[in-house]
Amino acid sequence: MASISSFGCFPQSTALAGTSSTTRCRTTVAARLADQSDDFAPLRSSGGNCGCVNNSGEFDRRKLLVSSVGLLIGALSYDSKDGDFASASQFADMPALKGKDYGKTKMKYPDYTETQSGLQYKDLRVGTGPIAKKGDKVVVDWDGYTIGYYGRIFEARNKTKGGSFEGDDKEFFKFTLGSNEVIPAFEEAVSGMALGGIRRIIVPPELGYPDNDYNKSGPRPMTFSGQRALDFVLRNQGLIDKTLLFDVELLKIVPN
């Protein structure tokens, strides 16, 4: 639910399969933006304040979080190597791209580390505690976004990132490293993290949910709306890039 204003206008993409294909592509994008205009309308209070402030004058943390993620998604679409915005075709699996690396992101972000598997990660905060390793049971807090589809959020915790963790892990996600309980990207990202760290990962489809089904491997969205948003992206064949973005905070390690 990131604000579309953070993306700015979609740049014109180069021709994919002739002029007519390019025109259809642009028309489709424009139609989608029109359909989504209500969802992405700027939030304003009756007094003209920013939508991150409620009627009582207090900051609305959820709106502030979503706005910051919107800025991130906009930044991710910027290719700093040649100074141009990435074309829309790099984020969407257009029909003209079938058979040409289907479903894989074309973007490599210079401030992220890319592993041999294709996972890209960036430590937002380096932990100072012990390192998680295979066999350990870990407790994490996580956010998830469909960066291939308007940067929509499908999971967000209502807890302040970086706050103290007092041992009550009932509402947090927990799994055992090496048990194949989670998608490969989650397993790889958490392995080697230090306790207290926060890691942002960009997940290509091949490291995501098997068979495009979030019920087969964790983490699973906890809300119906989150499940719908993720399911729509995973099951929509031929139109949407399935690249995902996760923020993972390592809260607790129970050694094997």
From Swiss-Prot:
Entry keywords, A to Z: Chloroplast, Isomerase, Phosphoprotein, Plastid, Rotamase, Thylakoid, Transit peptide
Gene3D superfamilies, sorted: 3.10.50.40
GO cellular component terms given for this protein: chloroplast; chloroplast thylakoid lumen; chloroplast thylakoid membrane; thylakoid; thylakoid lumen
InterPro entries: FKBP19-like (IPR044208), PPIase_dom_sf (IPR046357), PPIase_FKBP_dom (IPR001179)
Enzyme class: isomerase
PROSITE patterns for this protein: FKBP_PPIASE
Localisation: Plastid, Chloroplast thylakoid lumen
UniProt modified residues of type Phosphoserine: S164
EC number in record: 5.2.1.8
Family: Belongs to the FKBP-type PPIase family.
Role description: PPIases accelerate the folding of proteins. It catalyzes the cis-trans isomerization of proline imidic peptide bonds in oligopeptides.
Protein name: Peptidyl-prolyl cis-trans isomerase FKBP19, chloroplastic
